[in-house]
Every structure is written in structure tokens, then in C-alpha cells.
Amino acid sequence: MKIVIADHSHISYASLISDTITDSARVRGTGIAKRTPEYIITKMENGHAVIALDGEHFAGFCYIESWGHGKFVANSGLIVHPNYRGHGLAKKIKHKVFQHSREKFPDAKVFSITTGLAVMKMNSDLGYKPVTFSELTDDPSFWKGCQTCKNYDVLTRTEQKMCLCTGMLFDPEKQKSDANTGKFNQKVWTRLKNIKQARFLKKQPK
């Protein structure tokens, strides 16, 4: 298994990556924004993505987005192929793309919005802190990317103040003065997630 910076030589995997993201969102019922093969290819050609390969077989992927003229960076689209789940690969990909982000954008704040407890745990281990959406980028092009998420109506109903996703932020300036990243409490995050779902998800008619 190798995890490398994606480039033009990996564009043949773009359709499979796009389909894997879409299938994961459908099977898990989670809010994951869809990404077209063309969008993924652009990320690869710009050196803004990492890919995990088991020989010639696709195993995982994640890409970098920058907002506010490089002041904010997001690691998005983290996905592991079903054949390679349950072995800690997602964590390795997350660490690789985070390191790559810090090298390309050393002064940028790195943020994440996610509904997944596993991703929250990985973010917390890297030094991310939970924040309100107002502390994230106000770049409209970022929030436009949420339109393909099935929970987008929640974001619009709350005037972009809250969603089922939890916002998390790594601030390099604050990190210098706060070496303690804190501990991830899964019970607390699970309760927060359940509260959001109960409050914002529309009940299905019987």
C-alpha cells in the first residue's frame, strides 16, 4: 500500500473515486457532497489531492480546497474503497493530506465540516477544535459545494449558521500557544449529532 500526492498519472481513477463517494453517501445515509470525475481530475492535476493505491488497485482518496485567497484550507472528500475499510487507512490518508496542506499553505487555517464520528476523532488528534460555522470561511463558493449534499436544506433553513455537520478548525497560530489538543469524547459527539438530527431532519410521513 502506498499513499502519494496525486497527479496526471492518476486521472484514470477519477470516475471510480467519484462513484465510490456517491455510493458511500447512499449506503451510509450520510451527508457527503458529490464530486464529478472532472472536478477530481482538476485536483489531481493541480497537486491538491492524495491517493492510496494497493498496487494498481484504488484504495482511498482525499483532496485539498483553498478559500479566501489561501487563508482557509479544507481537506475534503475523504473516502476509502469498501475493500480496504476497517484497517486504519482513512487515518493514514487524513494524516498525509493534512501534512500536504500544511506544506502548501503553511499559514492557512485548516477546517473541516463532517457528520462522521471517525473523522471528528481524526481531526481532534491532529489538533482541530470544534467551532461555529461563523468561524469558518465565508467564501460563497465553498458553501455552494454543499448543494449536492442531501442535508443542504438544513443549512439554508438555518441561514448557514448550523447543519448536521460539525465545524472543526486547526489554527496554526493558536496551535503554537496551545500544545494540548484535548481528548476526543465519543459520547459527547454522538449526543451532539443525535440532537442535531432530531432538531433539523424532517420527519418522514407514515
Predicted regions, residues:
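A short beta-loop-alpha structural element at the N-terminal edge
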Residues: 1-17
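Conserved residues at beta->alpha junctions
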Residues: 5-8, 80, 114
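Loop/helix-junction capping segments adjacent to catalytic residues or to phosphate/diphosphate-binding pockets
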Residues: 11, 83, 87, 117
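A conserved beta-strand-loop-helix scaffold within acyl/acetyltransferase catalytic domains
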Residues: 18-82
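Conserved acetyl-CoA-binding loop-helix of GNAT-fold acetyltransferases
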Residues: 80, 86-101, 110-112
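Terminal substrate-recognition subdomain of acyl/acetyltransferases
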Residues: 102-107, 111-206
